[in-house]
From Swiss-Prot:
Subunit structure: Homodimer.
EC number: 6.1.1.6
Gene name, Swiss-Prot/TrEMBL: lysS
Annotated coiled-coil segments of the chain: none
Origin species: Shewanella sediminis (strain HAW-EB3)
Protein name: Lysine--tRNA ligase
NCBIfam families for the chain: lysS_bact, PRK00484.1
InterPro entries cross-referenced by the UniProt entry: Aa-tRNA-synt_II, aa-tRNA-synth_II, aa-tRNA-synth_II/BPL/LPL, Lys-tRNA-ligase_II, Lys-tRNA-ligase_II_N, Lys-tRNA-synth_II_C, NA-bd_OB-fold, NA-bd_OB_tRNA
Subcellular location, record wording: Cytoplasm
Chemical reaction(s) catalysed: tRNA(Lys) + L-lysine + ATP = L-lysyl-tRNA(Lys) + AMP + diphosphate
HAMAP family linked: Lys_tRNA_synth_class2 (MF_00252)
A GO molecular-function descriptor: lysine-tRNA ligase activity
Biological processes, Gene Ontology terms: lysyl-tRNA aminoacylation
One protein family per Pfam: tRNA_anti-codon
Length: 500
């Protein structure tokens, strides 16, 4: 047992003894639930922060606050609530009563205070403690003041401590909430209807990913946590709901990385009588307005860069992007779609770039992997990449001029994909053939290939109007709005490997 652990255990024992004494002298068994908190720290600071000491004393303002004790400086306590911090002052009479009744107040305890508002000699607002109550005794100490909670893994595993002591974390999750609310408000103003679709599917679909499998005992069938809501949302468009969206969780049984968490949040939407170009226009409008609304400017700092959400955003095909970011590769510079269709040519190109390839990769998969290897991380500013091959876009409509590619884009910012959208494939026979090709790919070893969904084909046979749909990764978008570089910093409780 380390000295640090011994010290912590000693502090915990001391606090438990204090709680036991409190229980012996408190009718609420040490956890009262009757304090009426009427005011928040930030509201008090905003309303009275500019008053002089004399003005406050003359006004006789009484305020009732509650929160966690974050510091003790002589007779002063720093109390933190959800809005911020404010001081409370314990005069001599109060200090004496506090000691007799509670046998010592510790950092981390939650208290309620009522009293008159004053200004300290240093110009700080404080509440003079006329009434007070210990609401919750903290049995464990907070991290030391100067060391804080610096271990990243502990921050993720014990997010409750992280939120108490790290203002940056609190601000990041407040921003996350604002981003989600702003997106929802934008969609409603655009006359989209918010819906909820199943989280458990009998057939996983809507994306190329490995699902989590579970079992429904009553029905005695295998079920899958959804990897995407796409096929259900498009069924609703078939049913006549022309503009729908859903903000919810998706689950993909894949690896962990700074960009990936197996449980993540997606906003997916579909609009009838539109195409993928309409989606790009809508995305520009949405992100520009949200950035300006929440941050006061469409230009946001991100690492060493400044990301400009103001638009217009760059648009180029996947093939052109590969050429742009490989200017000295003669083979790439002369490459045409005819060569992209040649799987041996693409295999040799990938190998020449030092890439490890899978034997079942198609021409489209090879093109996408080369793009990811050589171009994706260069896309710092908002960029729509178009021209995705049909063999990696089984739900997207083929391009009228080039049937090898589809009317699909992925949206990149900060060197990573944030959104994926396309004109929907509404040809039931073409969709049937593409599902069958996905089954063949799965049989060949591609774990992420899609399953065949007969009911979705039946829905298409009833007629899906010309439709465009898009999914936006909320977590990755929030990373940009909070200037964070790992997805775990914007997910309250990210997936972690079990300890021990």
């Amino acid at each position: 047992m380390t000295e640090q652990v011994q010290d912590e255990n000693k502090l915990i024992a001391e606090r438990r003894a204090k709680l036991e004494h409190i229980r012996e002298n408190c009718p609420a068994n040490g956890h009262p639930n009757t304090f009426d908190r009427k005011h928040k720290a930030a509201d008090i600071q905003a309303e009275f922060g500019n008053n002089t000491k004399e003005e406050l004393e003359g006004m006789g303002i009484v305020r009732s606050i509650a929160g966690r004790v974050m510091a003790k400086r002589g007779p002063f306590l720093v109390i933190q609530d959800v809005s911020g911090r404010i001081q409370a002052y314990a005069g001599k009479d109060v200090q004496k009563d506090l000691k007799a009744k509670f046998q010592g107040l510790d950092i981390g305890d939650i208290i309620g205070v009522t009293g008159q508002l004053h200004l300290s000699g240093k110009g700080d607002l404080y509440v003079n403690m006329e009434e007070y109550e210990l609401l919750t005794k903290a049995l464990r100490p907070l991290p030391e003041k100067f060391h804080g909670l610096t271990d990243q893994e502990t921050r993720y595993r014990q997010r409750y401590i992280d939120l108490i002591v790290n203002e940056e974390s609190r601000e990041a999750f407040i921003m996350r909430s604002k981003v989600v609310s702003a997106i929802r408000n934008f969609m409603v103003k655009k006359e989209f209807m918010e819906v909820e679709t199943p989280m458990m599917h009998t057939i996983p679909g809507g994306a190329s990913a490995r699902p989590f499998e579970t079992h429904h005992n009553a029905l005695d069938i295998a079920m899958y946590l959804r990897i995407a809501p796409e096929l259900y949302l498009k069924r609703l468009v078939v049913g006549g709901f022309e503009r729908v969206f859903e903000i919810n969780r998706n689950f993909r049984n894949e690896g962990l990385s700074p960009r990936h968490n197996p449980e993540f949040t997606m906003m997916e939407f579909y609009m009838a009588y539109s195409d993928y170009k309409d989606l790009m226009d809508l995305t520009e409008e949405m992100l520009s307005s949200i950035a300006t609304e929440l941050c006061g400017s469409p230009k946001l700092p991100y690492g060493e860069h400044v990301v400009d959400f103001g638009g217009p955003y760059a648009r180029l095909s996947m093939l052109d992007a590969i050429k742009k970011y490989n200017p000295d590769n003669a083979t790439i510079q002369s490459m045409t779609y005819e060569e992209v269709k040649d799987v041996e040519f693409m295999r040799n190109l990938a190998k020449s770039l030092g890439m490890t390839i899978e034997k079942f990769w198609t021409c489209g998969q090879l093109l996408e992997e080369i793009f990811g290897e050589t171009a994706e991380t260069q896309l710092m500013q908002p960029t729509f990449i178009t021209g995705y091959p049909a063999d990696i876009s089984p739900l997207a409509r083929r391009n009228d001029d080039n049937h090898f590619i589809t009317d699909r884009f992925e949206f990149f910012i900060g060197g990573r994909e944030v959104a994926n959208g396309f004109s929907e494939l509404n040809d039931a026979e073409d969709q049937d053939n593409r599902f069958k090709a996905q089954v063949d790919a799965k049989d060949a070893g591609d774990d992420e290939a899609m399953f065949y969904d007969a009911d979705y084909i039946t829905a298409l046979e009833h007629g899906l109007p010309p439709t465009a749909g898009q999914g936006i990764g909320i977590d990755r978008l929030v990373m940009l709005f909070t200037n964070t570089h790992t997805i775990r910093d914007v997910i309250l409780f990210p997936a972690m490997r079990p300890q021990g």
